[in-house]
């Protein structure tokens, strides 16, 4: 099924700092449309911590033909009284070929005493250079896109 639009609305009760991570509950309402059909899913889980600095993880995968490197960079996140902005950047490369994917999500924050509209926006971009094997590029684009979506939802 192909979703034509995905919107997320989030209510976060308390902001969590990277230094003191605690279990804070958050409720996300995810609405997806497919033609005339509208699907809604409500998820309650612990809130992601606010990352106040940039952190990078590197994953190296080797097989008999090549070595592939994936670099995931998160943060820094910014927080105001009304919203939190999270940025996730994925870099996937093979040799001289590099694919860069960035997604930024702004989540509305509500305190327990006030009520405001929740909204979510995202932007993504992809660029590539070099000549990695087509099968690797196709598989990596799909895997990274799926990883981005599952991480941010």
Curated annotation (Swiss-Prot):
Keywords: Cell wall, Glycoprotein, GPI-anchor, Ion transport, Iron, Iron transport, Lipoprotein, Membrane, Secreted, Signal, Transport. Residues 131-153 form a propeptide. It comes from the Eukaryota. The keyword Signal applies. The GPI-anchor is attached to the protein in the endoplasmic reticulum and serves to target the protein to the cell surface. There, the glucosamine-inositol phospholipid moiety is cleaved off and the GPI-modified mannoprotein is covalently attached via its lipidless GPI glycan remnant to the 1,6-beta-glucan of the outer cell wall layer. Glycans are attached at residue 92. It is found in: Secreted, Cell wall; Membrane. Residues 73-98 are annotated as: Disordered. Residues 1-18 form the signal peptide. A lipid is attached at residue 130 (GPI-anchor amidated glycine). Involved in the uptake of non-siderophore and siderophore sources of iron. Has a role in the retention of iron in the cell wall and periplasmic space. This is Facilitator of iron transport 2.
């Amino acid at each position: 099924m192909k979703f034509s639009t995905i919107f997320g609305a989030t209510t976060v009760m308390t902001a969590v700092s990277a230094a003191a991570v605690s279990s804070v509950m958050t409720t996300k309402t995810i609405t997806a449309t497919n033609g005339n059909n509208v699907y809604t899913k409500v998820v309650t889980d612990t809130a992601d911590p606010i990352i106040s600095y940039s952190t990078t993880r590197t994953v190296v995968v080797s097989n008999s033909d090549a070595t592939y490197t994936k670099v995931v960079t998160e943060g820094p996140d910014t927080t105001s009284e009304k919203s939190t902005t999270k940025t996730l950047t994925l870099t996937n490369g093979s040799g001289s070929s590099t694919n860069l994917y960035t997604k930024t999500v702004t989540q509305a924050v509500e305190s327990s005493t006030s009520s405001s509209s929740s909204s979510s926006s995202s932007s993504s971009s992809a660029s590539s250079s070099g000549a990695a094997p087509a099968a690797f590029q196709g598989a990596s684009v799909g895997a990274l896109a799926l990883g981005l979506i599952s991480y941010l939802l």
